[in-house]
Amino acid sequence: MATAAAQKPQDIMAIRFFQAIFESSTFVGTHYILGSWYTEKELGKRSGIFTASGLAGTMIGGFIQTGIHSSMDGLRNLSGWRWLFIIDGLITLPVAVYGFLLFPDTPRNTRAPYLSASEKALAISRVPEVSERTPVSWSFLKHCFSTWYWYFFVVLWILAGETESFSSNALLQLYLRNHPTKKYTVAQNNNYPTGVPAVGIASTLFWATLTDFMGGKRYLVGYWIAVTGIITSALILAYPHSTTIHFAMYYWAGSVYACQATFFAWANDVLRYEEDSLRAVVIASMNMGSNAVNAWWSILFYGANFAPYFTRGMWAMIAVSIAMAAWTAALVWMQVRTEKRREITGVTHATVMGKGEEQHEGGGFDQGEKA
C-alpha cells in the first residue's frame, strides 16, 4: 500500500527492497512446509495448487487493472495505478492474518488448532523420521556444500528461472505496447496477457497431477520446458513480423510455469531422507540463486529497449533450454545413483551429524567426484 504514496522512482526502489526482505521466505518456506507433510504421490498436486494460486492472482490482477483504470482513474485526485496498490494492500491484510493464525508449521511442531492429536500423530507417521535438529555451524555448512544436492538443484532452478523469462518479464505486454503497426488500448494491454498465466495454471495442475500419478517423475517437466523454450524462440525468430505467432508462442511459453511446482517438489522428494535443515538450505538456495542471476539476466536479454522482437533474448532462451535438457538428464542420473546406494547400504534416513558416516552415503561426493 505504501507504493500508492510513492512520488519518485527512488521511493518505489526503497519499498521494493524492504518488501523483498519480508516476503523472501514465503515461496520457499511454503514449499518446505508442503514437503514436510506430503508423500511423493501427493506433493506435486499440493505444490501445484500453491503455485497455481499465485498465477491466478496474476491473471485476475490484469482484469482488476482494467476495471480500476476505467472506473477509478482520477477518483479523489488519485491515478488508477495508485488505487491498484491500495486495493492490493487491502486484499493482502486478511491473508496475512490468516497465515499468522493458521499456518500449520511442520507435523512435529504444529500447533494448528484445527488438527486433533490423532491427526497430528497420523501426519508424523506418514513421513520419514528425521534426525535431530542440526545447529548452524561451519561443520553443517561444509556438509551442505559437500553434497551434490545443493549444486544440482541450485543450477536446475537457475536454468528453470530463466526459461520463465518470456512470462516473468511480461514480453507479450511489451510486444503489444511496442507493436510496429498496431496500437492496442490500455484494456487490451492489460487483458490479452492474462492468457499467459491462464496457460500456466492449466500446465501446472496438469504436470503436477501427472508426475504424482507416475510416482514422482518430476524430470519430465524439465524436458517439456526445454522443448517449449526451443520451439517458441525459434518460431518467433523465424516469423518476427507475425502477430499470430507472437501471441501463440507467448501463450505456449506460459506452460513453463509448471516447473515451479514440480521442481521444488522434486527437491523435496530427493531430500526426503536427509536432514530437514539440509533440505531447507537447498530449497532456499534454489530461489536465491535464481533471483541473483535473474537480476542481471533480464536486463541483459529482455530489457524494454529490445522490444518488440527481443532477438537477443530468443537466442538466450534457446541456449538455456538446451542446457536445461542436459542438466535434467544429469540430475536424474545422480538421483538414480543415490537411490541405488541407499538400497545397498540400507540407509533410509539421515543420521545425526557427528554420530556416524551413514548420513553422507546419500548425498556426499566421493573424492573422485570432488575432482
Show which residues each predicted segment covers.
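Helix-breaking motifs and short loop linkers at transmembrane-helix boundaries and internal kinks
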Residues: 4-11, 22, 38-39, 215, ...
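Hydrophobic core of transmembrane alpha-helices in multi-pass small-molecule transporters
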Residues: 11-25, 33, 244-262, 266, ...
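Cytoplasmic helix-loop-helix junction between adjacent transmembrane helices
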Residues: 15-52, 68
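A gly/Pro-rich, aromatic-decorated transmembrane alpha-helix motif that marks the paired
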Residues: 28, 50-75, 93, 97, ...
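Central mid-sequence intracellular linker of multi-pass
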Residues: 40-54, 63, 75-143, 312, ...
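Extracytoplasmic gate region of multi-pass secondary transporters
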Residues: 62, 139-211, 219, 264, ...
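Flexible cytoplasmic loops linking transmembrane helices in multi-pass membrane transporters
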Residues: 104, 112-174, 178-184, 282, ...
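Cytoplasmic membrane-interface "Motif A"-like loop-to-helix N-cap segments
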Residues: 212-227, 274-275
